[in-house]
A protein has these predicted regions:
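Short amphipathic, positively biased membrane-proximal segments
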Residues: 1-142
Length: 142
């Protein structure tokens, strides 16, 4: 025996997007907090990709981007600051892109870097786009 309007049950289930929003926020916050912390725990790899054209010490930029990443990651966890933090994440992802491009340039000039390492350096460049899009989704949903 079929219940009345049984076919509507599937169609009226809540959309999964709102349920994924907290996961998106927590994933982004965890990534920023983790990578940001690494800027202080092991700064040398980050120092090495700071473009030489920038004035001042590479360590300054390593620590500054680490502070930004940790701060944005923490701000994403608080609903009151989430919207602004998501917008800051977009700006951060755009601002560190030149360092990622510089890493590709440096690794292709360094004979000690293997071909797989060079490929990884290039392959990670397009990942900035989905990171920016995820931050924009958090911004719009906050």
């Amino acid at each position: 025996m079929q219940l009345p309007h049984q076919h509507n049950v599937i169609m009226t289930l809540p959309a999964s997007a709102p349920q994924q929003a907290p996961t998106r926020v927590y994933r982004m916050a965890a990534m920023l907090l983790g990578i940001g912390s690494l800027h202080f725990i092991a700064p040398k790899p980050f120092d090495s990709i700071v473009p030489a054209e920038l004035p001042g010490s590479p360590r300054f930029y390593t620590y500054a981007s680490g502070v930004a990443e940790v701060g944005i990651g923490a701000a994403l966890l608080a609903p009151k600051t989430r919207r602004l933090a998501a917008l800051a994440a977009v700006a951060l992802y755009i601002s560190v892109f030149p360092a990622n491009v510089n890493m590709v340039r440096l690794w292709f000039q360094d004979p000690s870097k293997s071909l797989p390492m060079r490929i990884v350096a290039i392959a990670r460049l397009p990942f900035q786009v989905p990171m920016i899009l995820e931050a924009l989704k958090v911004y719009r949903a906050s």
